[in-house]
Curated annotation (Swiss-Prot):
<dbReference type="InterPro" id="IPR029069">
    <property type="entry name" value="HotDog_dom_sf"/>
</dbReference>
<keyword id="KW-0378">Hydrolase</keyword>
<dbReference type="GO" id="GO:0005829">
    <property type="term" value="C:cytosol"/>
</dbReference>
<dbReference type="GO" id="GO:0061522">
    <property type="term" value="F:1,4-dihydroxy-2-naphthoyl-CoA thioesterase activity"/>
</dbReference>
<dbReference type="Pfam" id="PF03061">
    <property type="entry name" value="4HBT"/>
</dbReference>
<dbReference type="InterPro" id="IPR006683">
    <property type="entry name" value="Thioestr_dom"/>
</dbReference>
<comment type="similarity">
    <text>Belongs to the thioesterase PaaI family.</text>
</comment>
<protein>
    <recommendedName>
        <fullName>Putative esterase Rv1847</fullName>
        <ecNumber>3.1.2.-</ecNumber>
    </recommendedName>
</protein>
<dbReference type="InterPro" id="IPR003736">
    <property type="entry name" value="PAAI_dom"/>
</dbReference>
Length: 140
């Protein structure tokens, strides 16, 4: 899944929200993506565990980047927007690194569906989500 030299979504792309979150992509291509995030105190909720919104944001960002890469490698450009994000929280953690991996479930002309799994330092699943994305035509 390493990006090719002509990848439509290079690893060094800067997305302000992802940067604020601390999300770093390690692999990106039309068939999937991987990213990691260092759990810091500002990402914790009152009880001291990672806020569920962090996982929702990771899942949508990772799925969106992979979907964008696929759309632009199999079409005439364009973009994607999330239309549904269904995230399940499996296990709570309060520190360490988390790793997200996206895999396609459906990639069609109008929509895509991606599954993202987030694991901790010991490879335990901490969250899992599906994101449905709408493919948008390139603007003239």
């Amino acid at each position: 899944m390493q990006p090719s030299p002509d990848s439509p979504a290079p690893l060094n792309v800067t997305v302000p929200f992802d940067s604020e979150l601390g999300l770093q992509f390690t692999e990106l291509g039309p068939d999937g993506a991987r990213a990691q995030l260092d759990v810091r105190p500002k990402l914790l909720q009152l009880t001291g565990v990672v806020h569920g919104g962090v996982y929702c944001a990771m899942i949508e960002s990772i799925a969106s980047m992979a979907a964008f890469a696929w759309l632009n490698s199999h079409g005439e450009g364009g973009s994607v927007v999330g239309v549904n994000n269904n995230t399940d929280f499996v296990r709570s953690i309060s520190s360490g690194m988390v790793y997200g991996t996206a895999e396609p479930l459906h990639r069609g002309r109008r929509q895509q569906l991606w599954l993202v799994t987030i694991t901790d330092d010991t490879d335990r699943v901490v969250a899992r989500g599906q994101v449905r994305l709408q493919n948008l035509e390139a603007r003239p």
